[in-house]
């Protein structure tokens, strides 16, 4: 569009890699006449690039080899995108909530890069479930009430509405929020919504799943006592002592543990590792209900990656599994406290 009038206009040019004019940049006495109309020597470019590539003074900065690589890289991208099948469309969901003093850095472009080449976005914008410009802090009780209601309402208005009315039924989820809210998002998605959940890695800093081959040994420990008061400690991102749980629930609590040999915050690297963790979560839900009964109280103490928290909520079956209460660690509150 014209920047002044916003009217539609054609701003494209055909540029030559090897100039057809003897006075042009990168002119080659042998190649230029042969390749004057050859597609391998032509580039479709904008006005700015056309002027740049045709500037004789910039010829050393833009030799033929560089332009050929730029042309090939772009053509490879176009070939990749046009080869994607229609059933590979996906709705991008972005959900962020304030964590302590930090807001959630979620960007549509970063999400798109993580999708390709397996899926590509349905629209040029995402389904946003975040509460914008929230002044509440996660140490405030009001924070949890407001964030939970906002998440449920926006999920119903946008995600549930899309599932009921759109032909595309796949979702790609990018979320950064306190773990109780991530688990809640997972319970809303459940397995009713076909979805891929993405993890923000620290090193390298990317949403792309990595091709890690290392298998994770998920360790499950059952409680020494059989109690109707049950805690599930998920110590994957960090270690969590039993005392931090019994100080909240009491010494008569049966504590189940899901952990790994060396908990740390960047262990989850691949889809396969997340798939195995889902299976572990599902088995533990079944075992807790079987060993403690349907009338047991279940309390969740999570320390896990964001994708794991969402998947934990997804595998929970509201009609079959025990209802649970989720706790969050906060120094301002003196440790774990009840949230949702």
What are these regions (language model features)?
Residues 2-43, 53-64, 68-70:
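Histidine-centered nuclease catalytic patch
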Residues 50, 172-183, 235-241, 299-310:
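Gly/Ser/Thr-rich loops at beta-strand to alpha-helix junctions
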Residues 77-158:
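Charge-rich interaction segments
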Residues 151-163, 273-294, 308:
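A short, acidic, amphipathic alpha-helical segment used as a generic capping/interface helix at domain edges
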Residues 166-206, 309:
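Hydrophobic, ordered structural segments
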Residues 191-220, 263-270, 323-340:
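Long, charge-dense
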Residues 213-283:
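Redox- and metal-dependent alpha/beta enzyme cores, enriched for Fe-S-associated oxidoreductases
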Residues 287-340:
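C-terminal functional regions that serve as terminal interaction/effector modules
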């Amino acid at each position: 569009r014209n920047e002044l009038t916003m009217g539609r206009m054609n701003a494209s040019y055909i540029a030559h890699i090897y100039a057809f004019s003897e006075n042009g940049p990168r002119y080659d006495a042998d190649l230029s006449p042969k390749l004057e109309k050859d597609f391998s020597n032509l580039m479709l470019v904008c006005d700015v690039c056309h002027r740049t590539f045709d500037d004789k003074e910039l010829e050393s900065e833009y030799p033929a080899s560089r332009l050929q690589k730029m042309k090939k890289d772009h053509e490879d991208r176009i070939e990749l995108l046009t080869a994607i099948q229609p059933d590979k469309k996906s709705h991008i969901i972005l959900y962020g909530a304030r964590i302590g003093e930090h807001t959630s850095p979620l960007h549509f472009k970063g999400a798109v890069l993580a999708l390709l080449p397996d899926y590509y976005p349905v629209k040029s914008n995402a389904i946003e479930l975040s509460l914008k410009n929230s002044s509440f802090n996660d140490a405030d009780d009001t924070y949890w009430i407001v964030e939970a209601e906002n998440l449920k309402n926006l999920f119903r208005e946008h995600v549930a509405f899309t599932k009921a009315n759109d032909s595309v039924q796949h979702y790609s989820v990018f979320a950064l929020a306190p773990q109780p809210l991530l688990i809640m998002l997972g319970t809303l998605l459940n397995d009713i919504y076909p979805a891929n959940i993405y993890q923000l890695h620290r090193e390298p800093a990317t949403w792309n799943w990595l091709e890690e081959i290392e298998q994770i040994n998920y360790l499950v420990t059952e409680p020494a006592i059989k109690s109707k008061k049950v805690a599930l400690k998920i110590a994957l991102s960090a270690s969590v002592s039993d005392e931090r749980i019994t100080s909240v629930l009491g010494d008569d609590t049966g504590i189940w543990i899901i952990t790994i040999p060396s908990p740390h915050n960047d262990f989850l690297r691949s889809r396969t590792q997340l798939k195995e963790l889902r299976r572990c979560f599902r088995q533990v839900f079944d075992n807790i209900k079987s060993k403690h009964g349907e009338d047991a109280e279940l309390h969740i103490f999570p320390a896990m990656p964001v994708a794991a928290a969402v998947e934990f909520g997804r595998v929970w079956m509201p009609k079959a599994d025990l209802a649970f209460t989720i706790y969050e660690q906060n120094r301002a509150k003196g440790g774990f406290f009840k949230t949702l």
